[in-house]
Amino acid sequence: MVEINGVPVEDTFCEAFKGLYARFIVTAADERPLREAAENVAALPATVFGESEAGVERWLDPEETPDGRPGFVAQMWVEYGDDAVKKLEHELGKRIRQGVLVRPTTRVFDACEDPDGYIDTERPIGRCADGYEYTDVRFDREMVHVPIMMGEFLIERRLGYAEGVAGGLVWLFCEDVDAALEAGYRAVEALRDVEGVITPFNVCAAGSKPETIYPDIGPTTNHPYCPTLRDRILDSKVPEGVEAIPEIVINGVSLDVVKRAIGIAIEAATEVDGVVKVSAGNFGGKLGDYRIPLRECIRE
């Protein structure tokens, strides 16, 4: 078994899935609405319910944005399938209208590199101006203007989308919750420097499984890995001395960038005292579009 920073990394793999994502920049005149917009965009990962999930990729200085204001890069994802583009358009409308447009001074710009296609934002977002929307060229881009009660909300007319890789993950077996929090957030922060990835759950406390006695509600708790059930069930897979197992889920624009991100997350997390093992969840190779062995993610 390979060790990183003295912590064993189990010889296993995670499964990841094809997804469709939009990548865009949000800017604002003030840090307060910008932070609120980021929280709104990234809130409530809900692809398991047929909706969307999103996250902040990185923060931008004014010189890095089209309009010279502070901002952030975000990704929003839906499951891949025949109706994925239609679903992505609908979900973008929800998250941007209710999460960004309502925050004062915000603007949205396309940031998708090498897109497979474009969504015309005039329909799902611009038309909430109820006929008062209009387009012109600002910042060398075609922008849709939406008059609002604090001025105008601007969004680029075309937002690109592309196929990516969603659901790569790593598990951190920790001695206690304090170690799990420190290791988990250390991993998430390390990924802020990796272009093209997000962690839609940040530090996830509740990994799930597809098998359930309540199929009407969707995925449920991954009970073999719940430390409080270790002495109550026969199929517990929680070792003695482990009291918390945070999960770091990673979506990225390519398989290579997801693998690189998993390796960086492992390196960062294993620097924390109290991490006793690194592993990953999978479905026996039966569900995912990709199998990602952890050993292939670790940098030599």
UniProtKB/Swiss-Prot annotation:
Lineage, opening ranks: Archaea, Methanobacteriati, Methanobacteriota, Methanomada group, Methanopyri
One of the protein's GO biological processes: one-carbon metabolic process
Coiled coil: none
Keywords annotated in UniProt: Transferase
GO molecular function: formylmethanofuran-tetrahydromethanopterin N-formyltransferase activity
Keyword DNA repair listed: no
Protein name (Swiss-Prot/TrEMBL): Formylmethanofuran--tetrahydromethanopterin formyltransferase-like protein
Similarity remark: Belongs to the FTR family.
Disulfide-linked positions: none
Protein species of origin: Methanopyrus kandleri (strain AV19 / DSM 6324 / JCM 9639 / NBRC 100938)
Pfam families the record matches: FTR, FTR_C
